[in-house]
Amino acid sequence: MTTHVTLEDALSNVDLLEELPLPDQQPCIEPPPSSIMYQANFDTNFEDRNAFVTGIARYIEQATVHSSMNEMLEEGHDYAVMLYTWRSCSRAIPQVKCNEQPNRVEIYEKTVEVLEPEVTKLMKFMYFQRKAIERFCSEVKRLCHAERRKDFVSEAYLLTLGKFINMFAVLDELKNMKCSVKNDHSAYKRAAQFLRKMADPQSIQESQNLSMFLANHNRITQCLHQQLEVIPGYEELLADIVNICVDYYENKMYLTPSEKHMLLKVMGFGLYLMDGNVSNIYKLDAKKRINLSKIDKFFKQLQVVPLFGDMQIELARYIKTSAHYEENKSKWTCTQSSISPQYNICEQMVQIRDDHIRFISELARYSNSEVVTGSGLDSQKSDEEYRELFDLALRGLQLLSKWSAHVMEVYSWKLVHPTDKFCNKDCPGTAEEYERATRYNYTSEEKFAFVEVIAMIKGLQVLMGRMESVFNQAIRNTIYAALQDFAQVTLREPLRQAVRKKKNVLISVLQAIRKTICDWEGGREPPNDPCLRGEKDPKGGFDIKVPRRAVGPSSTQLYMVRTMLESLIADKSGSKKTLRSSLDGPIVLAIEDFHKQSFFFTHLLNISEALQQCCDLSQLWFREFFLELTMGRRIQFPIEMSMPWILTDHILETKEPSMMEYVLYPLDLYNDSAYYALTKFKKQFLYDEIEAEVNLCFDQFVYKLADQIFAYYKAMAGSVLLDKRFRAECKNYGVIIPYPPSNRYETLLKQRHVQLLGRSIDLNRLITQRISAAMYKSLDQAISRFESEDLTSIVELEWLLEINRLTHRLLCKHMTLDSFDAMFREANHNVSAPYGRITLHVFWELNFDFLPNYCYNGSTNRFVRTAIPFTQEPQRDKPANVQPYYLYGSKPLNIAYSHIYSSYRNFVGPPHFKTICRLLGYQGIAVVMEELLKIVKSLLQGTILQYVKTLIEVMPKICRLPRHEYGSPGILEFFHHQLKDIIEYAELKTDVFQSLREVGNAILFCLLIEQALSQEEVCDLLHAAPFQNILPRVYIKEGERLEVRMKRLEAKYAPLHLVPLIERLGTPQQIAIAREGDLLTKERLCCGLSMFEVILTRIRSYLQDPIWRGPPPTNGVMHVDECVEFHRLWSAMQFVYCIPVGTNEFTAEQCFGDGLNWAGCSIIVLLGQQRRFDLFDFCYHLLKVQRQDGKDEIIKNVPLKKMADRIRKYQILNNEVFAILNKYMKSVETDSSTVEHVRCFQPPIHQSLATTC
C-alpha cells in the first residue's frame, strides 16, 4: 500500500534538499571546521584500577592517589579560569556617595545580592588552596619519610606533583594580578557590614582571612614554601621533580605546547621552592644533585613562556627572586638582558618552511594512496606499513606542536616587551600598553611570518584531519603489536633467567606485566612455555603466535605496564639491590627504549584531541590581563589591537600576492578562541565578545577584500585597454606605467562555504554583492563625470564605459553579476525612461553650450569654441572625489588616460560624433534630433523671423547690379552706399549672426551625426555578414569555376547562418525576432534611408511665412531687382561679413564659424532661391568685375583686393554647402514629384512689332 504524501509535504521535502552540502571543487585555503561528531575520550582517570588485580598492588594504590590528585588539578584549573575571566562587578554597581543618601540601603542590599555568589566562590578558592597545599605537602612528607626515601617513585607520579607546583604558580600569579577581585570583595564587605550580615565572630574572621589572603601578594607561594621547609628532605623530592622535567624537556618528551611550557615553569618554580633557609640549590648543584647550567641554558633559549591566557612569565624571575641569587648571580646567564634568537621568527622561517615542505611531501604520498584512491581502511597492511603511518602521525603532531609553541612564545615575548615611540616611529606616545604590545610591536616581515606559520599549522591540520581514520587504524594496530610483541616475546628471556635464578620479586613484576597486557592467541598463556620453568627453548624453537588487532590499551592498563617496566630499570627499588642489576644489559636497553616510545601512546590513542591541542592558537585573542590593567577604562579593546585582525588586515593592506591565499587562516583564530571560551573557560560572555568582534571584522574583511578585487580587475582592464604605443612612448621618456601585479584572488572567489563560528558563509556571494554595488557606482561616476563637463568629454566617457565593460567581463569569470547592459541602463536611469542621463546631458550641452558657443570649420571638419562667447558658460555640477579605481583603475592609469583624452578636449569632431552614435543609439539620436528641430523652429519662427522682417524693411527697395563699365571700385562704393543701413545695423553682427549660427550648428550636427551613424552601420553590416550568408566573391584561378568555389564557401559558413539555425531549433517567437533582425540589418543601408533629408524637410516646413519669399513678382516670373526675397537679404549679410576687419578685430569666421553660412545657405536652398542667389548676389558680382579689372583700391576704408579674396573663399564654401544640400534635397524632390511641372511662356516680341500688331 502506497503512502499518501500531500503536496505541501512533498514541496517541503524538496526544499530540504537545498540544505544538503554538495561536494565542490572549492580550493582549501581555510582550517578544518569543528567536527560535529563527538570526540571519544578513553581516559578513565584510573576508575578501572581495581580490575587489574594481577598488577603490583603498590602501583594500583598509587593509581588511586593519582586519580584524586588529577581531580584536584581539574578543580585548580577551574579556579584559575574563574580568576582569569573575572570582570569587576563593583564598577557597574552605583556607589553610595554619602551617608545621607536616601536609597543607600537599597544600593547596599543589591550589592550584597549581586556579589554574594561571587564572594562565596572566592571563599571556596581560599579553602581550596589551603587543601591543595596540605595535600601536596602530605604527599611530599610521605615520600620524604626516612624509610621511604629509597623507594621507587614513578615518573608519572613525579610529573603529577610537578603539575601541582605549576598549578600553585599559576593561581598565585592570577590572584596577584586581579585587582578587580579585591575591589569586589571590598565592596561586598562594606555593604555587608553596613547591613550587619556578618554578625557572628566566625564569619567576621573568615571575611578578614579572605581579605588578607587576597591582599597579600604571593600568599600561596609563601604558605607552600613555609610548609615545605618543615619537611625533612623535601628538597630531594623537588630535585627529582625538577630533574624529571629537565630530562623530559631535553629529550622532547612532550607533545602539546602547554606540556612544554609546564616543564619549564616547574623547573623555575621548583628551584625557587628548593632555595630557602633549609636548602641551597647551589649546594645541590655542587653535589651534582641538580644541573643548574643546563636549566640556565633552557631559560636563556626560552626567556618568556605563557602562564595563563595572555599572562606571561619571565622564567628568570623565579631565579632572581630565589633566596641565594645575589651571591650566585654570576652563575646565571638567563638573567642578563639579551634577546634570544628564539623570538626572531623571521630567522626561523627558513627551517620551518623546509620542515613543512619535507613533511607535506611525505604526507601527500600517503594521503594520495590512503584517502584519494580509497585504499586506506579496506586494505590490510603489514606491521612495517602501520609503523610508518604511526611515525608519520607522531612527527606531524610534533611539528604542529613545535610551530604552535613557537608562535605562542614569540607572542608572549612581545607582550612582555611592548614597543614605544622611540623604538617604533609609527607608535604614538599616547598608545595604550596593549596597543604597544600588539598593534605597533610587529614589523611587516614578522606579521607575514606569523601568517605563514599559522597557515602551515592550519593547513597541515586539515591534511592530517582527513587522514584521521587511517591514522587511528595504524596507531591502534602499531600500539597493539608493540605491546604484545614486547610482553609476549621480548620479556620471555628475562622471565626465563629470573625463574632460573629464582628472583622472586623480578618474576612477580614480569608476570604482572604479562598478565596485565597480554592478549594470547588462544585466550590463555601457553602452559608448556619453557620460559615459565626456566628452561631453554627446544632446538626447533618455541612458536608463539602473537595476534594482530586494531585495539589500543586503556589508559590505566598503559599506566600500569609503563610504571611496572619503569620499576625494573629504576635506580631506586626500596631494597639494597635494585631490580635493574638483575637484568642483562640488552634487556635493560630494550625496556628503556620501549618505555620511551610508549610515552606518546596516550596522546596518539586520542589523536583527534591531540591534533586540536597541538594546533590551538586561541590565546592570541584573549586579553583579560591587559583589560585588568586598564582599571575599567576599557570594556574591550578595538579590533585594531586584536591580533587576528591585525594579521588579516596586514594582508589586505599590503596586497601581498603570495599571502592573499592565507587571508582566511588568521580569521580562524577566532574559531580557536570561541571554542576555548565555550569548552575550556565555559564563559558565554567571552564567546559573545568574540562573536561581536567577528561580526565587525568579517564585515570589514569583505568590504576591504571586495574593494581590492574590484580595484585589481579595474586596473587590469585599464592596463589592457591602454594604448600600447602610448605606453611604449612613455617608457622611452623614462615613465613606466606598471601593469597590476598578479594576485591570487581567484582562489578566494571560489570560497562558497567559509566556516566561521559555526556559520557557513558564501564568501563569493558577499563579495559579488559588494562588487555589484562598486560596478554600479563606477558606471554612475563615469556618467556623473561626463555630466560635470562639456560635450568634448563624451569620448572619455565611452572609454570609461569600455574599461568598466572589460572589468565586468573579467569579474564574470569568477562571480555571477547582472549583465553589463542592465547595470549600465540602471546607472544611466534608462530602465523605464525612454532616454537616459547621457542623452539628456548631450542635449543639454548642445542647447546651452554647443549651438551658441562653437564654431564649425569645414576644412578640419571640427567644431571649436568661439573666440567671443555670446552666452554665459553654463553651470555644471562638480564631480565627486572618488578613489582612483572608480575611474581608470589606479593613479598612474588616471594620469595616462587624462593625457590621452586631453587631445580630444578642445574640439568636437568625428570621434565625438561616432561616440555619440554608439552611446545614444537610434532612440537617443531621435530624441536629440527632435529637440534640436524644436530649437531651430523656435529660432526660425521667432528671433530670426523678427530680424528678417526688420532687415527687409531697411533694405533698398530696388538694387540693380551695376554694369561692368563702372569698374570694381565703383561697384563696391555703390553697394556700400545701397547697403549702408544694413552695414550699420547694430544687432546684425551679434544677435542676428548668433541666431543663424545656432541654426547652422544644429543643421551641421544632424549632418555629421548621420555620417557617423552610416559608418557605424557599415561596420555593423560587415560584422553581421558571416551570420547572414553575405559572403565576398572569392578569387579564382584560371580554369576554376566561381560557382563551385562559392558553394564550398557557403557550406563552410553554413553553421554560422543564424536564421536557418533558429528556424530549425528556436521557438516561433525567436524565429520572428531573428527574421526581423536579419531584415533590418540587411535593408537599413540598402534602401538608402537618410535622416538628414527628413531634417531638411522638417526645417522647410518652418519657412512658411511670406517674408521669406516676398510678394508675387509683378512680371509673373521672378523678382530681378527688387529686394524682397530672403536671398537678397542674405546677399546683404554676406556683403557685411565679407568686409575685411581691422588688425585687432575678430572675423566672422572666428566668431561664428561656418555655421553662419550653413544657416543662410540652407534657408536659401530650402526656399528654392539658390540659382537666383548665385545670379544676383552682390558679392559675386563684385568679385566677377574685380577679377576682370584687377583693381585694388580702398573704398570707404574697405580694401578692395582683400574683400575680393574673402568673397572668393565664401563662394567656395557656399558652393560646397549647396552641393551637399542639393544632394539630399534632389533625392527628396525626385521621390515626391514624379510629374515634371513645366510652365510655358509666350516668346518675347520686339516693341516695334508690338505697335504694328
Curated annotation (Swiss-Prot):
It is found in: Cytoplasm; Nucleus; Cytoplasm, Perinuclear region; Synapse, Synaptosome. The modification N6-acetyllysine is found at K1037. The gene is Cyfip2. Component of the WAVE1 complex composed of ABI2, CYFIP1 or CYFIP2, BRK1, NCKAP1 and WASF1/WAVE1. Interacts with FMR1, FXR1 and FXR2. Interacts with FMR1; the interaction occurs in a RNA-dependent manner. Interacts with RAC1 (activated form) which causes the complex to dissociate, releasing activated WASF1. The complex can also be activated by NCK1. Interacts with SHANK3; the interaction mediates the association of SHANK3 with the WAVE1 complex. Interacts with TMEM108 (via N-terminus); the interaction associates TMEM108 with the WAVE1 complex. It comes from the Eukaryota. Part of the WAVE1 complex that regulates actin filament reorganization via its interaction with the Arp2/3 complex. Involved in T-cell adhesion and p53-dependent induction of apoptosis. Does not bind RNA. As component of the WAVE1 complex, required for BDNF-NTRK2 endocytic trafficking and signaling from early endosomes. One of its GO terms (biological process) is positive regulation of neurotrophin TRK receptor signaling pathway. Belongs to the CYFIP family. One of its GO terms (molecular function) is small GTPase binding. PANTHER family: CYTOPLASMIC FMR1-INTERACTING PROTEIN-RELATED. GO terms for cellular component: cytoplasm; neuron projection; nucleus; perinuclear region of cytoplasm; SCAR complex; synapse. Expressed in hippocampus (at protein level). The keyword Acetylation applies. This is Cytoplasmic FMR1-interacting protein 2.
